[in-house]
């Protein structure tokens, strides 16, 4: 049976981490297997909870999403690594399938996991939010997290670059993404600021009024129409309506903030940075 490691990065995740660690406990039953938690300065009980579950805890300053996940994976010793976010949960069915598949010594080097995104506690089945495949399970040292060059303005949405064949498992990784509207809006505020700064750094902010209106006014509305109507997001009820409405708002925020930052730069006014 191949040995298994789980890698998780954390910051103030005391509400989510117990659920995540409980969901992988059966995957690391061998004493040679491990859960590695890399924490970047939690002020709540995150570190204590990780240790209570028997995880190897490393405290390290925050270098960025991809760099922190690369570091966590580098500490893993298993033949296979499962990389998780602290708000993700391995379903019992997925847990069982992972064990069976890895025991069969598959020819593939990596597996996509279908992610079931929850918004205000409801599974978002439509509007492009499912199955949301993520490459999370792979042989050690065959993969590393890299910021995608084709989506540079999305610096926190890291992907895995790897060499080899990949397959998709049948069951779901449950993503407890946004339990409250406040949580979601704070998240979008932070992400839109990060995205705006990338646009400014790459010189992708136009002074044209037409371009400004296109990105701030029209793109959000067309995106909402596409995802909520044509991709059937309305079938996810009120939660679906709110998710697509506020995601469209995020798009508008990102370009409006980029315009604001670029204007401040041109006026010689510094803009305070913020961490992702």
Each predicted region: which residue ranges?
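Short aromatic/hydrophobic "clamp" motif used to bind/position activated sugar donors
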Residues: 81
């Amino acid at each position: 049976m191949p040995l298994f490691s789980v890698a998780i990065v954390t910051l103030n995740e005391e509400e989510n981490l117990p659920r995540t660690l409980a969901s992988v406990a059966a995957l690391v039953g061998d004493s040679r297997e491990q859960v590695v938690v890399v924490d970047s300065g939690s002020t709540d009980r995150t570190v204590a909870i990780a240790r209570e579950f028997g995880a190897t805890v490393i405290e390290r300053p925050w270098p960025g999403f991809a760099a922190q996940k690369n570091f966590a994976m580098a500490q893993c010793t298993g033949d296979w690594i499962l990389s998780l976010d602290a708000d993700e949960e391995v379903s019992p069915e997925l847990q069982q399938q992972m064990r069976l598949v890895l025991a069969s010594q598959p020819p593939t080097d990596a597996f996509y996991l279908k992610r079931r995104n929850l918004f205000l506690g409801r599974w978002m089945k439509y509007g492009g939010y499912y199955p949301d495949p993520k490459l999370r399970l792979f042989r050690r040292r065959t993969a590393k997290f890299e910021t995608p060059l084709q989506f540079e303005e999305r610096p926190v949405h890291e992907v895995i670059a790897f060499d080899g064949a990949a397959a998709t498992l049948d069951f779901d990784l449950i993503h407890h993404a946004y339990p409250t509207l406040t949580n979601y809006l704070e998240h979008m505020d932070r992400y839109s600021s990060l995205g705006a700064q990338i646009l400014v750094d790459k010189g992708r902010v136009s002074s044209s009024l037409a371009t400004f209106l296109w990105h701030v006014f029209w793109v959000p509305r067309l995106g909402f129409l596409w995802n909520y109507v044509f991709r059937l997001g309305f079938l996810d009820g009120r939660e679906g309506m709110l998710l697509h409405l506020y995601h469209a708002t995020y798009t508008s925020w990102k370009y409006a903030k980029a315009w604001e930052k670029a204007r401040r730069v041109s006026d010689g006014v510094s803009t305070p940075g913020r961490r992702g």
